[in-house]
Design a protein with these regions (language model features):
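NAD(P)H dinucleotide-binding glycine-rich loop of Rossmann-like/cofactor-binding domains
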Residues: 77-155
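Residues that mark the start of a beta-strand
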Residues: 2, 27-29, 151
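N-terminal Rossmann-fold NAD(P) dinucleotide-binding loop
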Residues: 161-162
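Cytochrome P450 core scaffold surrounding the K-helix E-X-X-R motif
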Residues: 40-44
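Short Gly/Pro-enriched turn/cap motifs at secondary-structure boundaries
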Residues: 6, 19-20, 49-55, 96-101, ...
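Glycine-rich beta-strand-centered segment in the early N-terminal region that forms part
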Residues: 19-35, 45-82, 115, 120-122
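Extracellular beta-rich ligand/substrate-recognition surface
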Residues: 4-11
Length: 162
C-alpha cells in the first residue's frame, strides 16, 4: 500500500504494509479521500524520519458514505471524556493519527469506530478534511463561552486562530 512519510530527504510516497488494528478497541478500515496538510505535519517532517504515515486532517469513505475522522484516540469512559474533553483522555493517551500513529495520507487507514464522524447531506468528503481544523476553532470559542460585549484576545499566529 502507498503512504506518505517523512524521510531523510523530506517527504516521499513509500510502500508500507496494510494497516494493523493494534491498540484499537473497535477497528474500522477506511479509504482516505482528502487529507489536509497542517503546520503539525510540517513540524513532523522537519524532525526527520519517524516511521509514521502523515496526516491527521482526514476525510474518508466508510460503507459507501463520506466521513470525517476524529484524529485523537480516546476511551469515551474516563472523566475527561465524559465531560466532552476527549483531547484530555487519561486512557487513550496522546495517540494522534499522523503524529504518534499512522495517519490518513495512505491508501487505507485503521481507526476506532467511535472516531468516525458522519457528515451532513451536502458536505463532500473532499471538504470534510477541514472538519478537524474547524473543530479546533469552534472548541476554543465554546470553551470561552462568549457573550455580547465580551472582549476576547486571540494570542498566537496560528492559522486556526487567525
Amino acid at each position: 500500500m502507498r503512504a506518505v512519510r517523512a524521510t531523510s530527504d523530506g517527504v516521499a510516497v513509500v510502500d508500507v504494509p496494510s494497516p494493523q488494528a493494534a491498540g484499537i478497541t473497535d477497528p474500522v478500515t477506511v479509504r482516505p479521500v482528502s487529507v489536509g496538510i497542517c503546520g503539525s505535519d510540517l513540524h513532523v517532517i522537519g524532525m526527520g524520519p519517524s516511521g509514521v504515515t502523515l496526516g491527521h486532517e482526514i476525510s474518508a469513505i466508510h460503507e459507501g458514505r463520506p466521513v470525517a475522522i476524529q484524529p485523537m484516540a480516546f476511551c469515551g469512559k474516563c472523566s475527561a471524556c465524559q465531560r466532552g474533553d476527549q483531547h484530555m483522555c487519561s486512557v487513550g493517551g496522546r495517540r494522534v493519527h499522523g503524529i504518534h500513529i499512522d495517519g490518513g495520507m495512505a491508501d487505507e487507514l485503521v481507526v476506532d469506530a467511535q472516531c468516525l464522524v458522519a457528515l451532513p447531506e451536502g458536505v463532500s468528503a473532499e471538504a470534510a478534511s477541514l472538519v478537524e481544523p474547524i473543530a479546533v476553532g469552534v472548541h476554543a470559542v465554546n470553551k470561552v463561552d462568549p457573550v455580547a460585549g465580551m472582549r476576547i484576545a486571540v494570542i498566537g499566529a496560528g492559522t486556526v486562530g487567525l
